[in-house]
Amino acid sequence: MSDYEFTLRFQLQDENDNPENYLDLLFEAGCDDALVGVGSLGSISLNFTREALTASAAVTSAIQNVLSAIPSAILIELAPDLMNTTEIADIISDRFQKLTRQAVRKYATGQIARAKTRFPPAAISGSQPLWHLGEVLDWMVINEKISKPSVISKVNRLVETTQTIKIFNTAIQQNTDVPDDLLAAAKEIIISQTIHR
């Protein structure tokens, strides 16, 4: 079993609902492995470090735990997924190894020539482009920007988590449930990508 780190953001039924009212219920429902953000009325965020066999199992069990405590809550976002260059540099520096925003920007704009493959395209372009974190982490490993075996195993867990999150966020944006066959396909992709690293 491994630890998977992710954040779930929920909208509460009443926009004036105080999220502090749900702290005990969340703890009793099995969310004792989460830091709960209660700063805004009408919404609640939970930052999980959940032990599970797979990222999919960690995320789905966390969602089920929250919904058992707050059945009327609506899942609106999972993170980490879309990030700008600063956020990418921060998460890599915090969890794996030192990396500057300038380095990520240079990778993204092709200013660093020593790369086996092109940097992944931005998922959202514009003045502040956003990338899927999992795609950037994959690129960093393939291009040996992250190369220590002990770090790569941690990166692979985060990539698995972000791929699962991407599927859930897509379903949320399309206002659909995550179909069982999609989850099964995602698990196969995750497993095959992990084997090929």
Question: What is each residue range found by the language model?
Answer:
Residues 1-14:
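Short glycine-/aliphatic-rich beta-strand segments at the starts of folded cytosolic domains
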Residues 14-21, 54-59:
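Short, conserved charged micro-motifs
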Residues 19-43:
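A short, structured beta-strand/loop element
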Residues 33-39, 64-81:
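Conserved short beta-strand edge segments in small beta-sheet-based binding/regulatory domains
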Residues 43-53, 124:
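A short, exposed loop/beta-hairpin motif centered on an aromatic-Gly-Thr core
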Residues 53-60, 84-101:
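Short, low-order "capping/linker" segments at domain edges
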Residues 95-130:
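Major-groove DNA-recognition helix of helix-turn-helix-type DNA-binding domains
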Residues 133-191:
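A short, Lys/Arg-enriched interface patch at domain edges and termini
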